[in-house]
Amino acid sequence: MKDVLQWAIDHYETRDQLVQKGIWKGELYHDSIFKENSRGWLWKALLLCDENNNCLLTDNFKGLDLNQFGLVPVPMLADGDNYDENHNANVPKRVLHSNVSSSVGIRRLTPVEAVEKHPLSDDNDKTKGSLSKGSDEKPLTLRETLEIIDLDLSRIMLDDIFQEPKVHAQMRQLLYNYLLIHQSEHLQYKQGFHEILSVIYLQLYHGTDLDNTDLQNVLIIFNKLMNQIEPIFYNEENLINWDKRVFTKIFRICLPDLFSKVFYQPPKTGSGKKKNVDHLIHSNLIWLIRWTRLLFLRELPLKYVLIVWDHVLTFNYPLDIFIACTIITLLLSIYDELHELVSQGDYEHTNNNDEFVELILHFKKIFEKEDASKDDEKFLDLCKVTGNLCELWYGKNYDDMRLICDTFINAKFGIKTSDVLSMETAKLTIDPNRQSLENKLRERVRQTILKNKKKISQ
């Protein structure tokens, strides 16, 4: 870690330089500069510097331990204890230190039955129908909450260290303290929290148990990340609204052909003639639950999950937009498989969406056959495409968003979408300035892909 720390100090004076050059331009990932055990340092640099983003890396994090008062121990509950929220009056105030910010909103704990059937399960049948309003759910007691946490922690398969009793106890304490931080919002534990926390814990773990300072830093990083993802993706109503308000719109702009065949189809009238208005026939939520709540932990190899999280933790873009654009980019990476599926002759007539959902829920297996899963440079290119889509979305440059995707598909897979074909037939009528911009965008994507192909062939 000292090597990458010294390299970063020599190259970046501020957090902003680390973000823009080191992460978004990919400098940290070149020439094996970035070691596997350096990510804990990087995440502390991103999240433990001051709010003005002018933290000097040469400070070496001295004095940046925001939660100075330690963690609250998990209560020992004897048989028959009826511990409820009234006992929280005796909780030491140190865990509610003002520097550990919280979000606003009321969440409900996943019901007991969700321990056996929750939406993050790999089982597709279990995932269907998993969304519930949550308004009628009865909040669980502390004992029930800790029992679910213990069960979830025992199932973590990210690394063998999570089977060690001391690590289990520390993870349990971290989750308990996270819930205490947000006790005024009535936030309660849900499946998925433990998996997000396990990734962060693992990055600060270097072969020995975490000391109290490390545990506090894990909690701060976890809390800041969850402040962004929990209100949107762990709240069923907000997730549905995000799908309609953000994801569906971006999906339709970037991949209109795929979108129309998978989710929207023109209904037929009684006479067999089609109406003019399309209608939504399938929901994205069956698979979006897992993709969003776990931030791609089940969809990508861990080393690429960590790269995505590096970009997430820069918070260059609001998380709801960044996640939507990341999903689109990942779908672009397997567009050939998706295109083959929806191009079947009878797909529109027999489409019940099962095949598409099955393919998406096995995304990791398909992705691992693609070049981007074997070449860090190509995966970093996908991250840059995500950033470009975010920028264009904010600028309302929807045509350029589609152009980037069409060009990527054409250059990588040789598939010409309807938009590429229509542009080729309309070249004479396109404004010259517009044509110049489109050519530059198309050439940039083409050169990037050709450069990566040359590297592989050498």
UniProtKB/Swiss-Prot annotation:
One of its GO terms (molecular function) is GTPase activator activity. The keyword Hydrolase does not apply. Its main location: cytoplasm. The keyword Phosphoprotein applies. Pfam families: RabGAP-TBC. Residues 33-316 form the Rab-GAP TBC domain. Keywords: Cytoplasm, GTPase activation, Phosphoprotein. The modification Phosphoserine is found at residue 436. SUPFAM superfamilies: Ypt/Rab-GAP domain of gyp1p (SSF47923). It comes from the Eukaryota. Residues 116-136 are annotated as: Disordered. It is found in: Cytoplasm. PROSITE patterns: TBC_RABGAP. One of its GO terms (cellular component) is cytoplasm. Present with 2990 molecules/cell in log phase SD medium. Stimulates specifically the GTPase activity of YPT6. This is GTPase-activating protein GYP6. The lineage of its organism: Eukaryota, Fungi, Dikarya, Ascomycota, Saccharomycotina.
